[in-house]
Structures are given as C-alpha cells and as structure tokens.
Design a protein with these regions (language model features):
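Hydrophobic transmembrane alpha-helices
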Residues: 36, 40-44, 101, 105-109, ...
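Loop-centered beta-sheet repeat module
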Residues: 120-167
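Membrane-interface helix-loop junction between the first two transmembrane segments
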Residues: 5-14
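Transmembrane alpha-helical segments and their boundary/interface "anchor" motifs
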Residues: 17, 21-92, 96-97, 101, ...
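Interfacial loop-to-helix transition and helix-capping segments at the boundaries
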Residues: 18-31, 82-97, 136-156, 188-217
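Solvent-exposed interhelical
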Residues: 47-48, 102-128, 162-180
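Aromatic-anchored segments of alpha-helical transmembrane domains
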Residues: 1-3, 60-69, 124-139, 179-194, ...
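Alpha-helical transmembrane segments and terminal signal-anchor/GPI-anchor hydrophobic tails
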Residues: 150-151, 168-244, 248-259
C-alpha cells in the first residue's frame, strides 16, 4: 500500500486501485486514533516515561544506523546525528510532532479540568477550525498542512480528552456500521473526484481531511464499546511505536519504499 501511495490519488479508476484505496481508508485512521488514545488517558509526564521513550529511539536508531553505515547507505556524520539526536535527525515526523505534544500536554490536561461544558465545546470548535479549515482546506503551512504537524496532534489530543468525558454510546453495532459506511463513502468519493476534483475539499488521504477525521472519531468511539481482554492485543499495542521507528530507518525503509 505504501509503495503505491503516490499513485493512488492520480491513478485511473480500476477495481484493483479502488480496493487499495479501500484498504488505505481502513488503515489511515491509525495515527489519529493513536494520538486520541493519548488524550483519552492523558499523557503523564515523568522522567521515567521520557527516558524510556528516548532509550527506545536511541537503541533502534543506533542499531540500524550502524547497519546502514556498514552498507554505505549513511555517512558517518548522518549516522552520529541519528544516534545522538533520534527525535530531530531521524526523519520521523511522527516522533517530532509527538514530542511537541508530550511537552505541551500538561497545559491541556490542567486547562481542560477547569473548563465548563460550554467552554469545552467552544475550544473543540476552535481546534477543528484551526486544524481542518486553516490546516487542510486552506492549506496554510503555518498551521498544519496534511496533518504532519504538532497542531494536528494537539487537536486530536483534545478530541481524545473530550470523548473521555462524554457519555459512552452503548449501541456498538450502530457505530460499527457507521464507520463501515464512512469508509465505503470515502472510497466512493475517491472515485468521484477522478471526474469532479472539487470533492477533495472534503476527502483525501490526509490525516486532517474532514472525512478521515470523522472516520477516526467514529472508529475510536466504536472501539470504546468493545469488551476485549487479550495479552496478544496488549503486546501488539505496546509494539506499535517500535515498529514505526524500525520501519522509518533508511536501511529498512529502502526495502519497502521506492520513492
């Protein structure tokens, strides 16, 4: 999927291409949901949590950077920069944005506690306007073009906090069907925009496009209703960040990406 990603938007209509689009629409919400989970449970800053994350980054960056240097894919300077500055020199946009969120989150946590229901709704609207209208529809690089920005993560974090204080929906079937319908609609919109391009104002495979945001929130609320207890799922959950860091290393990504 990632291999063909640059061609998905401009590719001719075909069943095979639309099936790839469908799979992308199903999976693209993962990043948004990961950040919303952080907001739902709140980030708790501590030396231990930061050090644990930093050690994890240094370990994988050092391991694969040395391998890359050994195979001539990285210079000595790039190797040392990736080892000692894994957040900023590793080419991992997610880690840079998440670090910004990690540092700012205590302010959001404390501020949210002192807001009443009306103020929380107003602030939610403000975040959505900044992230979706200015960042996506207006394509303002100062804000959050395509969602690769800490502003988008702050919006998602706030949405996660907001959902945590909402009354949980008991009708998981309706939420599941709603999410499925949204994903199918997104796939149809992709086919339509081949003919009528202006529809991209509502949908494209960008993290802060309106339809992707809507699908992320509905899926997140649906997952809330699940009652699962699985060691395997927990193991996969804690491994997600490691998988992202590993696949972002040049020596690994070159095996999958040809662009």
């Amino acid at each position: 999927l990632q291999n063909c990603y640059p061609n998905l938007h401009g590719g001719d209509f075909s069943i095979a291409n639309e099936f790839r689009i469908l799979l992308m629409n199903i999976s693209i919400i993962a990043v948004n949901c990961f950040v919303m989970i952080s907001g739902y449970f709140r980030i708790r800053q501590s030396i231990h949590s930061f050090w644990s994350l930093y050690i994890q980054l240094i370990f994988y960056s050092a391991l694969f950077s040395v391998i890359g240097y050994s195979f001539g894919e990285l210079s000595l300077q790039d190797t040392l920069l990736r080892i000692f500055f894994p957040f900023t020199e590793g080419g991992m946009w997610f880690m840079v944005a998440y670090l910004g969120l990690y540092l700012i989150s205590p302010i959001l946590n404390i501020g949210y506690q002192y807001l009443n229901a009306f103020q929380r709704n107003i602030l939610l609207g403000c975040f959505i306007i900044v992230d979706i209208y200015l960042g996506y529809m207006h394509q303002s690089p100062e804000v959050s073009v395509d969602g690769y920005h800490v502003v988008h993560f702050l919006c998602l974090y706030y949405i996660g906090m907001y959902i945590s204080t909402m009354r949980k929906c008991r009708t998981n079937l309706k939420l599941g069907l709603s999410w499925s319908a949204i994903v199918i609609l997104m796939t149809m919109m992709h086919a339509i925009k081949m003919v009528w391009f202006p529809i991209t104002i509502l949908y494209s495979m960008r993290y802060n496009s309106p339809m992707v945001m809507f699908a992320s929130v509905v899926f997140f609320m649906w997952v809330q209703t699940w009652k699962l207890q699985s060691k395997t799922i927990n193991w996969i959950a804690v491994s997600v960040l490691s998988v992202y860091v590993i696949h972002s290393q040049p020596v690994v990504s070159s095996l999958f990406f040809d662009f």
